[in-house]
């Protein structure tokens, strides 16, 4: 009940205390692109904590700290807490007032906070998702938004089912303004859908429920095709191929290997291999892939079975700055803007924006800034697989300045003094360039790891 009461309070008060929504904007040289360039926003991992409030007892600032002392709580949050509503609102206000024209937005899941299971309920989870949805709809009434469910967008967390549920039905009703009847139907049944972009009729968004493949999800243990999503995905991609459409894949839990760990996939390995096979088969149709979940900023390049790069994948950093007490690093809040060619939907560039949380709390105003422009920062031509693969090759150079920048951006410029030793670098680079188990293992063995594993 405490979370429900706090949820109501945060919504009633936040609209009246929106201090200092100062907007940077696009860099000099005028990054407001000509109409020949299409744009879309990507936001992820909002993780609203309705209980967040400033109090002298730092163990009670937020439920998401789980009793730990909040380190330096301010109006826009704390690194041991999930997002206060004021932080989330500042992100969307920045987007609204940035001056950037966008065709649509993708929103890749995880609205509720990281709190113990007994502190949430199905109704509370639905209430949080409802709040985030209505916030977006009120600020962007004419923008088509494509959501994907996250592992926390359910109760109990991670246990997203293979059949219809109260949550699936609720989000299907909430997201009707953005989706057609067929998309709503599959969303109700399994938490996934495909939908054409209204402003770009030859571009289709496929929103996958990759939480079905997530390790902690016991609802899908020993199932070869949970909710028949693989079968549906292949059929949808095949239809897009026949109809000469291009597809952007969006989901919460990404494919591939976690860049901060050794030999750990973000989802169960069997499902990862199956998805990789499908993505390789239809790489000519898929023009980009976009994920969340890790809270970090990373790229991946999918290669075909001959080793040629065929797909670009982007994992976006979270809006929430939360970390556990055991973690040394976290991320500043981040949101991003992609640019694409509206003729063929090839990805051209990405502008990453961030909020320096320490500075925002100190000044009492949220000044979102441009962190980097991907092509300019790394001196590459575009965001095509060949360009990203070439960049990853540059990362392998000893003391690569390119990689030093990449690793700082991995944490959204949270701590520029952070370093990545040889083993850390191996995990990062192999995760970028190798998404399947055989090539990933070969990468670690041949290039970096001296011992057998």
Curated annotation (Swiss-Prot):
Reported modifications of this chain: N-glycosylation is required for protein maturation, secretion and phosphodiesterase activity.
Residues that, per the record, bind ATP: 114, 151-152
Listed cofactors: Zn(2+)
Alphabetical keyword list: Disulfide bond, Glycoprotein, Hydrolase, Metal-binding, Secreted, Signal, Zinc
GO biological process: negative regulation of cGAS/STING signaling pathway; nucleoside triphosphate catabolic process
pH dependence per the UniProt record: Optimum pH is 4-6.
Induction statement: Up-regulated in macrophages in response to cholesterol accumulation. Up-regulated by cAMP. Expression is stimulated by LXL lipid metabolism.
Cofactor remark: Binds 2 Zn(2+) per subunit.
Disulfide bond in keyword set: yes
Role according to the record: Cyclic-nucleotide phosphodiesterase that acts as a negative regulator of innate immunity by mediating degradation of 2',3'-cGAMP, thereby inhibiting the cGAS-STING signaling. Specifically linearizes 2',3'-cGAMP into 2'5'-bond pGpA and further hydrolyzes pGpA to produce GpA. Also has in vitro nucleotide phosphodiesterase activity with nucleoside triphosphates, such as ATP. Has in vitro activity with p-nitrophenyl-TMP. Has lower activity with nucleoside diphosphates, and no activity with nucleoside monophosphates. Has in vitro activity with CDP-choline, giving rise to CMP and phosphocholine.
Protein name: Cyclic GMP-AMP phosphodiesterase SMPDL3A
Organism: Homo sapiens (Human)
Classification lineage: Eukaryota, Metazoa, Chordata, Craniata, Vertebrata
């Amino acid at each position: 009940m405490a979370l429900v009461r706090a949820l109501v309070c945060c919504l009633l008060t936040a609209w009246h205390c929106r201090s200092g929504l100062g907007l940077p904007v696009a860099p000099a040289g005028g990054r407001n692109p000509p109409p020949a360039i299409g744009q879309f926003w990507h936001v992820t991992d909002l993780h609203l904590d309705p209980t967040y409030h400033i109090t002298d007892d730092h163990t009670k600032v937020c439920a998401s700290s789980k009793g730990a002392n909040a380190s330096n709580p301010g109006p826009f949050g704390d690194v041991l807490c999930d997002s206060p509503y004021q932080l989330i609102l500042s992100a969307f206000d920045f987007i609204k007032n940035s001056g950037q024209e966008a065709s649509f937005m993708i929103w890749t899941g995880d609205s509720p906070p990281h709190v113990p299971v007994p502190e949430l309920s199905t109704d509370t989870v639905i209430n949080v998702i409802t709040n985030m949805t209505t916030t977006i709809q009120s600020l962007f009434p004419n923008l088509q938004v494509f959501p994907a469910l996250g592992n926390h967008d359910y109760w109990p967390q991670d246990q997203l089912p293979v059949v219809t549920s109260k949550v699936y039905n609720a989000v299907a009703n909430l997201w009707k303004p953005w989706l057609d009847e067929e998309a709503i139907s599959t969303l109700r049944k399994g938490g996934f859908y495909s939908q054409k972009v209204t402003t770009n009729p030859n571009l289709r968004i496929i929103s996958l429920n990759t939480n079905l493949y997530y390790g902690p999800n016991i609802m899908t243990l020993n199932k070869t095709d949970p909710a028949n999503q693989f079968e549906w995905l292949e059929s949808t991609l095949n239809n897009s191929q026949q109809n000469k459409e291009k597809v952007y894949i969006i989901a919460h839990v990404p494919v591939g290997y976690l860049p901060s760990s050794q030999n750990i996939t973000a989802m169960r390995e069997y499902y990862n291999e199956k998805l990789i096979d499908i993505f390789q088969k239809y790489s000519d149709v898929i023009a980009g892939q976009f994920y969340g979940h890790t809270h970090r900023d990373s790229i991946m390049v999918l290669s075909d079975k001959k080793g040629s790069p065929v797909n670009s994948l982007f994992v976006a950093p979270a809006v929430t700055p939360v970390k556990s007490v055991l973690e040394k690093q976290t991320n500043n809040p981040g949101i991003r803007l992609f640019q694409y060619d509206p003729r063929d939907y090839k990805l051209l560039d990405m502008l990453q924006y961030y909020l320096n949380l320490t500075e925002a709390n100190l000044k009492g105003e949220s000044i979102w800034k441009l962190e980097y422009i991907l092509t300019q920062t790394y001196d590459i031509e575009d965001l095509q697989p060949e360009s990203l693969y070439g960049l990853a090759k540059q990362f392998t150079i000893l003391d690569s300045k390119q990689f030093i920048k990449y690793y700082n951006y991995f944490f959204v410029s949270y701590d520029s003094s952070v370093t990545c030793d040889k083993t850390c670098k191996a995990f990062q680079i192999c995760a970028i360039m190798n998404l399947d188990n055989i090539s990933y293992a070969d990468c670690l063995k041949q290039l970096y790891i001296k011992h057998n594993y």
